[in-house]
Amino acid sequence: MYKEPFGVKVDFETGIIEGAKKSVRRLSDMEGYFVDERAWKELVEKEDPVVYEVYAVEQEEKEGDLNFATTVLYPGKVGKEFFFTKGHFHAKLDRAEVYVALKGKGGMLLQTPEGDAKWISMEPGTVVYVPPYWAHRTVNIGDEPFIFLAIYPADAGHDYGTIAEKGFSKIVIEENGEVKVVDNPRWKK
């Protein structure tokens, strides 16, 4: 029996996919991710903002199938550090992914298991290929929601634990009105 093809609407202005599974990440869900822990705590106690929302259309976890999702990453900073997604490796490290920027201004921070990092700027129309074995995190460097579409193998899985434990070797900050990618003082090899 063949699987049934389908189509869904994606609202490029809001990032919402009709009928998708929605998940929400608040700043309080990201304890330990930002370098300035004091600024993180103050912002959580003051308002605990939504950092990002994901709208996912997922298939059965099997080789050959694809999942897709949009992420709405809101503007903001913790200290000097721009809001970002938690970031992850794939549980099956040899799986790749494709991201398409739909709205806003941001970028992707990518990293090998050894900590070699690369920054790719993203604006509407930018397509980023994430090769196998690279961790990846998106960052909103603008003043409006940064919205993108991700397409990835259904069996890729997500390894958030490695990033939660070690972090990324680089962070993205605003300094003197400029976006800078700098060494993460807390990164663990």
From Swiss-Prot:
Any Gene Ontology biological process: gluconeogenesis
Residues involved in Fe cation binding: H88, H90, E97, H136
Catalyzed chemical reaction(s): alpha-D-glucose 6-phosphate = beta-D-fructose 6-phosphate
Regulation: Inhibited by mannose 6-phosphate, fructose 1-phosphate and fructose 1,6-bisphosphate.
Keyword hit for Cytoplasm: yes
Domain of life of the native organism: Archaea
CDD domains for the chain: cupin_PGI
Thermal activity profile: Optimum temperature is 90-96 degrees Celsius. Highly thermostable.
Pathway: Carbohydrate degradation; glycolysis; D-glyceraldehyde 3-phosphate and glycerone phosphate from D-glucose: step 2/4
Family: Belongs to the archaeal-type GPI family.
Subunit structure: Homodimer.
Name listed for the protein in its UniProt record: Glucose-6-phosphate isomerase
Organism of this sequence: Pyrococcus furiosus (strain ATCC 43587 / DSM 3638 / JCM 8422 / Vc1)
Gene transcribed to yield this protein: pgiA
